[in-house]
Amino acid sequence: MSGLLPSRLVDNQEIINLVEHHSKGVFQGDLPKMLKTIEKLLNKSGIETRYWLNNDETPMTLMKTAFNSALAQANINKSDIDLLIYASVTRGFIEPANSTFISKALGLNCRNYDAVDACNGWVTAMDIINSKMKAGEIRHAMVVNMEFGMSEGGPGVPQNFTLHSADELDYKFPSLTIGEAATVTILSNESPDNFNFSYINRPDLSDLCTISLPKWELFCNEEDIERNAPTGGQYQFSSYAAALHDEGKSELIKVFYQHKIPVNDIHQIFTHTASPKMMGLVGEFIGANGNLYNIGNKTGNIITASVPFGIADAIEQGKVEKGQFCMGWVASAGMVFSALSFKL
């Protein structure tokens, strides 16, 4: 496994400065008061910094570097890879699959496709690969996660840093927590029974976190339109954080217990990085005090790269070793809640 962050360090004060810059002149109300509210919300989330692309960096270059590192760790040739899954939220193409451009960049001719499942993308890709390995269809597979959505003109900048009213913060605030990252996970079929997966699906909450495309209203329910209308069709990230957290806490706890693994048997639990403090509170509830590995305070919310980057970071820091029993624990838009357990 390999994970890389871009080099531009962005702290919370820079985020506040960006909001002030983009909102000055258009905000209807007390802007200094709103900036104080943002500061409090960022502190409440537990996120202190995040990393964005510098001017001399590209997602493809970082991905290639991560791939070369992961391939060296796996001690295989790239021609041994039978399947590549691109499992990110951020992407450049609806058609063809983004995986085709990744395969082209890496000189791969294996079967490849995208798995789209919001922040749960990596878990879903791992589940697909695990099923294919159990069926004896593939020997080696790779998951690529490239979360790079903070460049100008993307789903968050500048539109979600531009506040016209206090009400907009309800669905724009999560953009202020986003970081960027690239991860590559390579798997072999040596132990096809290594992974176990549990899920809870709540499609009734699908309108809480979206990035919609033109004519989006043709592809949802009438009751979904009101919440999505402010950003509908604009390729703009919309996420109602308060509602997500209210619903997410109980479902995260449920999916953990549904997995039926005693918390004391788990060496490290790798979590979604959306809100380190919220995950910490949920972790305390299940008794996961010393074994919750959440690097969101330094990375920000790195979306689908959260769990794989956490694993790669823990390996690099000497926090986990081969053979230790671990878990991934994710709350995602959709909403989807997942737990997967495995030995490294």
Residue ranges: model-predicted function:
Residues T37-K40, F93-G107, S151-H164, N221-R227, ...:
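Acidic-glycine-rich active-site phosphate/pyrophosphate-binding loop
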Residues K33-K40, E57-A74, L244-K260, F309-A314:
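Short, well-ordered amphipathic alpha-helical segments that serve as non-catalytic structural scaffolds
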Residues K64, T90-G92, F101-E137, H245-K254, ...:
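Claisen-condensing/thiolase-fold acyl-transfer catalytic domains that form or cleave C-C bonds
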Residues V116, A141-E147, L187, G328-A331:
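Short beta-strand segments
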